[in-house]
Structures are given as structure tokens and as C-alpha cells.
């Protein structure tokens, strides 16, 4: 997929999400706030359905996983023990010209998405190995036509007369990789204590990387001093570790067992981007599964495969879903093994969920800092040990974005006159669809609204999330529900009044069938159960 196609695809999804009430920018009437998003009527139902599907499949329908709901603000010593206070940071770069901040380890992605870098590469000549040659004349034309608009912060662009000859000679010596070309372009006037790469947004010079702690800090009580400092949790996992002994002592359960939690977390991301994918406020679905150290590798493989298949069962195309094991040099300091479930988003392949073997790191750290014994005594084997932990950790917001991306389709369907027209349809898995069925009276007379209302009430009573709509041509009503991802549309017409049957239209196949009106709730419920 090209950069333009990627942007177009994400723009189309973003537009539909706002138009149909899936996702809104937070505080939009005041210009919004970067890294925060609100979920509209359809979006909140989609998220609720994702969380419910996860809870049913990972907790309620299992005997070895129990739930927990921990406080967002915890004793700050928790984060000292876990290492977050001293080590939960990212390398940050700051552009001295445009004042943008971004993570140093995101530079490759930002280069790939940069407009001025793309136009620069197009101005040169690349060989089969991707090595770029940029002659003086072409560089000068790029500065004049594109650089002055797209890379205003670059010293070379601002003062080409002074720097062009030296830069052109260096670049012209031999073909270079794009990153090497960018470093040469950014060298003129570069201050000390700078990163060699120019800013991917404006071409300006960047500060050297410095560590930036990602935790949101707040204060408890009336005084804002060091003794009152606290943090919004950056992950839900530590609350589970702190309550491990409480669950073990109060609930009749023993290793191997898991503790699950769904909840909000907060990270002061340097550069939130890619729509809802990387936000400062987000929701997590996490399990900490406690097991004997000798069984950890087996349980790790089990949870890794289970979590991958869960996404496939809920509609993500396996060709776009990848299970990637981390190389040894990628592993976090606490992990023996880790795998990412990755998805092909419009902006690139990125992590949807991580599954890690965290060993006994967390429980050991909390035992050291709290003085509480985190060992488990097995009265059958007479062994005392600190359990190893397998952690499947997924994001609700990332899952929602993946399911929306996968569901978005453009195809053709007949209009009211039978003519084929382009339609946009969200082919969400029925378990996740915000609305399961829409009820339409064909016209607002002849007893049809009354009959449709009766079906609507019966569906609601049966627990089927239903939408009632009697406004507009039937074709336009179908289109609205297609964009909302509603699997079934039920139309009440003249035959309904005479013979008690209705038309059921399938969102994906467009097939229609007639069934008794009284059977609609059971038909919808059965169809959803079969998925």
C-alpha cells in the first residue's frame, strides 16, 4: 500500500467513524486535545462488546481465571518497586525550529511518513538497492519548488547560497542511503548536542535524545509537595500483582490460575499518533497468569496461541494478523520470552497485543519492597515458590481500531430502483456489532409502525440490541445501517399486516428472506450464537 493509499484509507475510516458516531475527537468544540478520544453511541457499544467478548472467553467461561478491578491511583511505592519511577521513560527528541517532540525510536516511521522527505527522494535518482543520487541541479530545484514550503526549518533551505555547494559536493560523491543523505542535508549550522537527523516535520535541527518519564504525576490532598505525589497508573498489571496474595487467600484457587482486569491506563506519550492507536488515555485487557516455574514455558505457548486465535475468530483476517516472537535483544529486562500479535493497520504493521513470560520478576520486586511474602506453599508437593507470570496484555482501543479497519468495505448494492450503487459497509463480527438488528416499517401508515414497534420491543425484551428507524426511503435506511455495521435489517411491509411475516436482510450477502414476525427475536439470537 502506498503512502497516499494509506492516508486515504485511514481518512475514510476516520470520516465514517465521526459521521456514524463511533469515535470523536475529545473536546472538539475547543479545538481538541492531542492523544485523547471520545467514543460515540456506536463506538461505546463496540468497545463494550469487545470487552464483554474478552471477559466471557477469557474469564467467565474458564475455571482458572478470576476478575479484579483495581484503583487507578495507588501508593507511589508501587511504582518505585516496579521500576516505573526510575525507568519508565522513552528517548525524546525536540525540534528547535517547530518545537515538536517525538520519540527517537519512532524516527524510521516518521521518515517514511514525512512529506518533505518523500518529495526529496522523488527529486533524486534511486538504484535497485534504494541508494539515492541527488545532483546539485536537482537539489537546487527541490529547495526552490518544494523545500521552502515543506522543510522551512532546514538551514540549507533557509540559506542555500551559503550551504548548497558544500552539501551538493558531499552528496554527489557516491550514491547514499536515504538516511545518510538526510544527515548530510541537516549538517549545515548544526549546533552541538544535536541529533544528526533533521526534523521529519520541518527539516529543523533536533536536540540530542533525552529520557522522558511517561507517567502522569498528580498530588493527593490539599498540599502539592513531594510527600503528596502520586501517579495515574501507566498499566493495570501492578494492581494485580499487589492483590495477588489477597486473591489467593480469599478465593479458593491455587496455581496455575489467572487474575484478569479491564481498565483505564495513562501514559504521557511524547507523540500520540495514528488516530486512536497511540493515545495518552487508553483501556487495557490484561491477565496475569500465575504458574509453577517449571510449567511457565508450556503456559506461555498456550496463551500466545489462544490470544492470536481469539482475534481470528472475531473477524480479523489471518493474512493481516501476525504472531511475532521477540528476538533476545528485544526482550524487556523482566521477560524470558515475549510475542506480539501484530495487525496490518493502514499506517503499517503494529502491535495489537503482547504475551510475555514475566518470570517471577514482579512478585519478587514487590516482596523486596513491601516486606510481604509472595511465595506460594503447595500443600501437596510441600514446595514453597514464587510463581512465574504469563501476561497476555491487549489494548481495547487498539482492538477497536483493528476491528473497524478490518470491517470497512466499499462495494455495490442496489438502490430503491434496483440500480447498483457504491455503498460503504462495516462488516463487523456479529458479536461485536454495536446494533444487532434494525427494525423498519416500510411506510408510516397502514399499521406498519405499530407492528414494527411491537417487534422492536420484543427484541429489546429478549436482550437483542435493536434500532428503530421509520424516516427516509428504505434504501437510505439500509445504507445507514450498513455503515453502522448492523448485521440484520427487518422490514415490516403490507404483507406483515396480512400474514404476519417480515423481510430479513443480511448485511454481508444482501440476501433477503421472509420469516414470521413473532420469530424475529429468536432468529436474531440464534444467528448470533452460530457465529
Predicted region positions:
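NTP/phosphate- and nucleic-acid-binding module
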Residues: 1-531
Amino acid at each position: 500500500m502506498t503512502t497516499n493509499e494509506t492516508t486515504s484509507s485511514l481518512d475514510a475510516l476516520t470520516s465514517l467513524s465521526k459521521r456514524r458516531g463511533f469515535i470523536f475527537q475529545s473536546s472538539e468544540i475547543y479545538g481538541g486535545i492531542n492523544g485523547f478520544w471520545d467514543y460515540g453511541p456506536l463506538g461505546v457499544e463496540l468497545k463494550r462488546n469487545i470487552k464483554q467478548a474478552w471477559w466471557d472467553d477469557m474469564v467467565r467461561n474458564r475455571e482458572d481465571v478470576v476478575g479484579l478491578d483495581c484503583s487507578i491511583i495507588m501508593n507511589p511505592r508501587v511504582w518505585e518497586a516496579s521500576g516505573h519511577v526510575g525507568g519508565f521513560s522513552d528517548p525524546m527528541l525536540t525540534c528547535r525550529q517547530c518545537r515538536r517532540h517525538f520519540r527517537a525510536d519512532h524516527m524510521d516511521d516518521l521518515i517514511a511518513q514525512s512529506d518533505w522527505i518523500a518529495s526529496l527522494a522523488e527529486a533524486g535518482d534511486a538504484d535497485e538497492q534504494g541508494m539515492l543520487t541527488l545532483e546539485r541541479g536537482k537539489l537546487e530545484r527541490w529547495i526552490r519548488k518544494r523545500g521552502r514550503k515543506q522543510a522551512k526549518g532546514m538551514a540549507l533551505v533557509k540559506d542555500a547560497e551559503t550551504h548548497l555547494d558544500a552539501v551538493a559536493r558531499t552528496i554527489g560523491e557516491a550514491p547514499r542511503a536515504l538516511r545518510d543523505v538526510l544527515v548530510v542535508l541537516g549538517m549545515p549550522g548544526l549546533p552541538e548536542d544535536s541529533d544528526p537527523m533533521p526534523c521529519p516535520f520541518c527539516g529543523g535541527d533536533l536536540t540530542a535524545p533525552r529520557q522522558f518519564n511517561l507517567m502522569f504525576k498528580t498530588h493527593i490532598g490539599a498540599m502539592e509537595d513531594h510527600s503528596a505525589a502520586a501517579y495515574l497508573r501507566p498499566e493495570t498489571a501492578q494492581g494485580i500483582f499487589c492483590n495477588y496474595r489477597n486473591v489467593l487467600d480469599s478465593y479458593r484457587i491455587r496455581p496455575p490460575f489467572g487474575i484478569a482486569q479491564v481498565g483505564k491506563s495513562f501514559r504521557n506519550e511524547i507523540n500520540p499518533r495514528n488516530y486512536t492507536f497511540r493515545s495518552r488515555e487508553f483501556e487495557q485487557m490484561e491477565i496475569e497468569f500465575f504458574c509453577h516455574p517449571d510449567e511457565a514455558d508450556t503456559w506461555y505457548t498456550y496463551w500466545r496461541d489462544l490470544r492470536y486465535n481469539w482475534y481470528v475468530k472475531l473477524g480479523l483476517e489471518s493474512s493481516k494478523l501476525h504472531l511475532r516472537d521477540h528476538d533476545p535483544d528485544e526482550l524487556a529486562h523482566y521477560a524470558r520470552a515475549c510475542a506480539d500479535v501484530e495487525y496490518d493497520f493502514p499506517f503499517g504493521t503494529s502491535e495489537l497485543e503482547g504475551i510475555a513470560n514475566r518470570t517471577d520478576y514482579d512478585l519478587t520486586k514487590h516482596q523486596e519492597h513491601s516486606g510481604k511474602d509472595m511465595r506460594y506453599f503447595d500443600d501437596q508437593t510441600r514446595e514453597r515458590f514464587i510463581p512465574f507470570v504469563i501476561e497476555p496484555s491487549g489494548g481495547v482501543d487498539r482492538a477497536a481500531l483493528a476491528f473497524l479497519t478490518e470491517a470497512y468495505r466499499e462495494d455495490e448494492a442496489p438502490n430503491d430502483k434496483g440500480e447498483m450503487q457504491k455503498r460503504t459497509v462495516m462488516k463487523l463480527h456479529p458479536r461485536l456489532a454495536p446494533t444487532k438488528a434494525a427494525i423498519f416499517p416500510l411506510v408510516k401508515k397502514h399499521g406498519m409502525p405499530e407492528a414494527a414497534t411491537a417487534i422492536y420491543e420484543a427484541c429489546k425484551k429478549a436482550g437483542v440490541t435493536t434500532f428503530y428507524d421509520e424516516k427516509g426511503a428504505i434504501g437510505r435506511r439500509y445504507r445507514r445501517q450498513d455503515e453502522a455495521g448492523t448485521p440484520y435489517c427487518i422490514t415490516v411491509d403490507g404483507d406483515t399486516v396480512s400474514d404476519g411475516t417480515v423481510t430479513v436482510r443480511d448485511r454481508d450477502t444482501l440476501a433477503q428472506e421472509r420469516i414470521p414476525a413473532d420469530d424475529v427475536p429468536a432468529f436474531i439470537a440464534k444467528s448470533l450464537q452460530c457465529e
